[in-house]
Regions:
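General secondary-structure edge motif
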Residues: 21, 77, 81, 162-165, ...
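Conserved mixed alpha/beta catalytic, RNA-binding, or beta-rich assembly cores of soluble enzyme
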Residues: 114-215
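Short Gly/Ser/Thr- and Asp/Glu-enriched loop/turn motifs at secondary-structure junctions
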Residues: 17-19, 113-116
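N-terminal basic/disordered segments at the start of proteins
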Residues: 1-37
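Alpha/propeptide regions of enzymes that mature by internal proteolysis
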Residues: 1-3, 30-113, 177-216
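N-proximal short alpha-helices
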Residues: 7-17, 66, 154-158, 162
């Protein structure tokens, strides 16, 4: 399947290719930004696939690709002989697409949302509002992020996410300096939420639950 692009309501761009699904918004030179986003997106999956065996191994040897290096840097603080760079893949992809947009186009505000892991670009008076909800979709309020805040990445991980989690948390959300850093931290926190030896928790090897996992 080839990379797909479509425009959504609210002047948003939808990009998809295999497991990668992005929702993108931009204020400013939007058309130029969207063209840059798609041009960069076209090769993302192939780049990651080329180094996937290494990225699924515990953090160690430095990968070559630009996105893979973002993943490696974000995962490095958590290197323990088990953790892999895949803990930061969604955030790193979002961050890379946003970087391509801001390099090409003058933007006051932009975001790239990769399945809930979000890379942000904010300047001047621009803000980004994050809605907070409970697992049963009860509205718990909002958080406004401004350009003066040291936050450019938001990520959520847990049992309800797209990837397997080693923990039992419904969701853990992290705000950080970059999307890849937020993704890595949220993944690790989600993995750490556990009740050892609880009789209502069933444990099994990850590869018996999903055959494409890197969790073993």
């Amino acid at each position: 399947m080839m990379p797909q692009a479509s425009l959504l309501s609210g002047d948003r761009l939808h990009l998809s290719h295999g497991p990668i699904d992005l929702i993108i918004g931009a204020d400013g030179a939007r058309n130029a930004a969207f063209r840059a986003a798609f041009a960069r997106f076209e090769t993302v999956l192939d780049e990651l696939t080329a180094e996937l065996p290494l990225l699924r191994q515990p953090v160690g040897n430095r990968p070559k690709g630009k996105i893979a290096r973002r993943m490696y840097r974000a995962a490095l603080p958590y290197a323990d002989g088990v953790t892999t760079p895949m803990i930061a893949v969604a955030g790193a992809v979002a961050q890379e697409i946003l970087a391509a947009m801001t390099k090409t186009a003058e933007l006051t505000r932009a975001y790239v949302n990769n399945g809930g892991d979000i890379a942000l670009h904010l300047t001047g008076a621009a803000t980004f509002r994050v809605a907070i909800a409970s697992p049963d979709n009860q509205n718990l309020g909002t958080v406004d992020i401004s350009s003066t805040d040291a936050i450019r990445g938001i990520a959520t991980s847990g049992q309800r996410g797209r990837s397997l989690s080693l923990g039992i948390a419904d969701a853990v959300t992290v705000l950080a300096r970059s999307a890849s850093m937020a993704d890595a931290a949220a993944t690790q926190l989600g993995n750490a939420v556990d009740l050892h030896d609880h009789p209502h928790i069933t444990r099994a090897p990850a590869n018996t639950v999903r055959d494409d996992t890197d969790l073993g």
